[in-house]
Amino acid sequence: MPHYLMPDGEKLYVREFGQGTPVLVLSGLGMQSWQWLPFLYQHRKKYRFYIPDWRGFGGSAQCKIPTLDAISSHWQDLNCFLNQYADTAFHVIAYSMGATTAMHGIQYGHFKDHIRSYLHIDQTPKISVDADWLHGLFAEKHADFKVILQNITDLLAQNAQYRLVSDLTASMRTELVKQWLAFIQLQATPSRTAALFQKAFQQIHLQKFMLPIQRLDYMAWYIQNYLDHQEDYRNALRQLDRPATFFIGEDS
């Protein structure tokens, strides 16, 4: 599996498999490229898949944190990858944070030129909520979402001397997981996932596995991105003149 050299000298891991028409898959926050295999591996004889592991996850877990915010950094990394396939147009599957990265690339770069068709899953074109746009991330629960993220940010700032979740004191680790559980419960209540997380939360030895990332500095970087994000990609999506499908909304 190849690693691609990024502008800052870090090596981004991209899972590649299959043969045929190229498909670029952009994962959501906390995902690793192998998690797509149950859905995509069966199509390997017809398509060649390219699935980057974002910095901090999977094969890119040891990449250093850049100075840019997470979405700008992801687009810079993705654009560097695309430069090595200058004449290639991909079927694009973009999920959650990966969809934000795709929209960012359409708005600020030439990502549209690399898109043959586009599947957009579970992401709003504008994360923030204001008087002009009520359909941001979590919509009417957006303020609650921001409070949870700020609580996690404050906790991480108070424990900046630690590198990993396992380095935290038991009480701090429990509080961190408690805040993450609140985030999970915000997504769908009631839900089987939330119930499973609640049971895991009650088991001390399982708590750290509830978190999508074990490095605290990366966790802080990603969360800060969602706290600060003010981009509006609606005009970018209007520019997209390729076949596109959107799975988005409360019941998607």
PLM regions and their residue ranges:
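Structural signature of beta-strand start/N-cap positions in the alpha/beta core
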Residues: 22, 48, 89-91, 116-117
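Active-site loop/oxyanion-hole signature of alpha/beta-hydrolase fold enzymes
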Residues: 7, 41, 51-93, 97, ...
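N-terminal cap/lid segment of alpha/beta-hydrolase-fold proteins
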Residues: 1-11
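Flexible "cap/lid" loop of the alpha/beta hydrolase fold
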Residues: 114-170
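Active-site acidic short loop of glycosyltransferases
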Residues: 18-20, 45, 86-88, 241-242
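Conserved serine/cysteine hydrolase catalytic core
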Residues: 192-252
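Conserved alpha/beta-hydrolase "nucleophile elbow" surrounding the catalytic nucleophile
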Residues: 27-29, 94-99
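Conserved HGGG/HGGXW glycine-rich cap/lid loop of the alpha/beta-hydrolase fold
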Residues: 10-64
